[in-house]
């Protein structure tokens, strides 16, 4: 494919990606509201359309990215960079401007979201480190691994290559969360 950088077509692809992405979110929000309002069929149609918009956005995104979605390590790096921009630049600027215009409550929300974006960046960087050091499915000490498909529990330094209960691959294992 020809080089897109700097072309009107690149700008159009960016606009199409942004438009489809925003439409997907709006339709998802509206589906939730329709369901709460007692319109299950309308909610389902909003969700179906939201999924269509997601696929449209994916098509434009892939073209912007050279035809494919990159590997997980590259995606984690890009995600961390995006989150860094959001908390260090975008939301800081937005909070400052909201305050200057007298919208203190909105400024506080921007600042609150900036803190969340910082946590997102940190999480992505830790995950990237795990991928780069091949520490996603093995740890230095014993941990409790749980199959995300069937719930099987294994204690050890390494997740099994295959779940002995449901035969799903190692990719389905994670350290068992205890957030209850």
Q: Where are each of the predicted segments found?
A:
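Non-heme di-metal
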Residues: 1-180
């Amino acid at each position: 494919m020809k080089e897109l950088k700097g072309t009107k077509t690149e700008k159009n692809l960016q606009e199409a990606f942004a438009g489809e992405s925003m439409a997907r979110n709006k339709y998802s929000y509206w589906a939730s509201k329709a369901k709460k309002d007692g319109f299950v069929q309308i909610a389902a149609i909003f969700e179906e359309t939201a999924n269509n918009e997601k696929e449209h956005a994916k098509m434009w995104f892939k073209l912007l990215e050279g035809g494919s979605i990159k590997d997980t390590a590259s995606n984690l790096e890009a995600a961390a960079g995006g989150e860094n921009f959001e908390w260090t630049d975008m939301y800081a600027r937005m909070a400052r401007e909201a305050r200057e215009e007298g919208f203190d409550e909105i400024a506080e929300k921007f600042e609150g979201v900036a803190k969340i974006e910082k946590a997102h960046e940190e999480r992505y960087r830790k995950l990237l480190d795990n991928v780069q050091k091949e520490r996603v499915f093995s740890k230095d000490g014993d941990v409790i691994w749980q199959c995300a498909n069937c719930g099987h529990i294994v204690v050890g330094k390494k997740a099994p290559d295959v779940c002995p209960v449901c035969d799903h691959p190692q990719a389905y294992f994670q350290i068992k969360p205890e957030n209850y």
